[in-house]
């Protein structure tokens, strides 16, 4: 029985991983479609589309899926949905601020799913503007270290408009104004430095430190929100101390 139980558990875990992978692929494809619709279907002349395609490729999205999404967005093929971007605001456990970015073809469904995820996981919705002011839109580029030093990265991107380089342990995070994102990304490429992702993101201006129990609750809320097909990104101002992060990895 123990063998069967272990197999069943493994099968369940694989199903969960496959489901999450499928959701991630769908969200990356949606980004490509919207970027192509907004700025045209040529990645060379549409930096947002270029970055959306690069992110999808690095996440192993099949090239055929990427190309079909690009064509749907640009109008070369029929079948693209009327995607709308909506941002919802709220608070999670311990007063952690939460911004939820949705890309949906059904506003009512998106609002309902976000509200249910929030209320079932210790959060509550907030009025527009009551949370957003705690975040600033920034350009964010992440790259693996690969024997690079912080000085190497700074030297490559400082003149291109980078504001900060953060050491995340196994990787670096470069922060810039959204308008400088393409210039910073291009500077990395010119220096022969590969990067994982480049995108506009919300960065918190004030963070809320949490203990292990609160961190688990907030991450459970984030998981529930990200489980919605309409949710593209979830941003919080949670600050997880190193000892709490280490304990979370053991969960």
UniProtKB/Swiss-Prot annotation:
Cellular component terms (Gene Ontology): cytosol
Main subcellular location: cytoplasm
Cell location: Cytoplasm
An example Gene Ontology molecular-function term: DNA binding
GO BP annotations, alphabetical order: regulation of DNA-templated transcription
Protein keywords: Cytoplasm, DNA-binding, Transcription, Transcription regulation
Lineage top rank: taxon: Bacteria
InterPro entries xref list: Integrase-like_N, TACO1_YebC-like_2nd/3rd_dom, TACO1_YebC_N, Transcrip_reg_TACO1-like, Transcrip_reg_TACO1-like_dom3, YebC-like
Gene3D superfamilies, alphabetized: 1.10.10.200, 3.30.70.980
Stored NCBIfam families: PRK00110.1, PRK12378.1, YebC/PmpR family DNA-binding transcriptional regulator
Similarity field: Belongs to the TACO1 family.
Name of the molecule in the record: Probable transcriptional regulatory protein Mvan_2570
Organism (species): Mycolicibacterium vanbaalenii (strain DSM 7251 / JCM 13017 / BCRC 16820 / KCTC 9966 / NRRL B-24157 / PYR-1)
Lineage, top ranks: Bacteria, Bacillati, Actinomycetota, Actinomycetes, Mycobacteriales
């Amino acid at each position: 029985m123990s063998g069967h139980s272990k197999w069943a558990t493994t099968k369940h875990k694989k199903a969960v991983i496959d489901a999450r992978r499928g959701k991630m692929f769908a969200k990356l494809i949606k980004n490509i479609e919207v970027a192509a619709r907004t700025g045209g279907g040529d990645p060379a002349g549409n930096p947002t589309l270029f970055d959306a395609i690069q992110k999808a490729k690095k996440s192993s999205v099949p090239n055929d899926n990427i190309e079909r999404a690009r064509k749907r967005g640009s109008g070369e093929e029929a079948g693209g949905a009327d995607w709308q971007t909506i941002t919802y605001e709220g608070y999670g456990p311990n007063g952690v601020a939460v911004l939820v970015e949705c890309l949906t073809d059904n506003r009512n469904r998106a609002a309902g799913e976000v509200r249910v995820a929030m209320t079932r996981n210790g959060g509550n919705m907030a009025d527009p503007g009551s949370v957003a002011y705690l975040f600033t839109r920034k350009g964010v580029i992440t790259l693996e270290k690969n024997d690079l030093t912080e000085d190497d990265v700074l030297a490559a991107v400082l003149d291109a408009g980078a504001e900060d380089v953060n050491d995340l342990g196994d990787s670096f995070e470069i922060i810039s104004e959204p308008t400088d994102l393409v210039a910073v990304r291009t500077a990395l490429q010119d220096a022969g430095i590969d990067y994982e992702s480049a995108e506009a993101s919300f960065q918190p201006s004030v963070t809320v430190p949490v203990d292990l129990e609160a961190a688990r609750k907030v991450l459970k809320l984030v998981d529930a929100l990200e489980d919605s097909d309409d949710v593209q990104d979830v941003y919080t101002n949670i600050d997880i101390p190193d000892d709490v992060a280490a304990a979370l990895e053991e969960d």
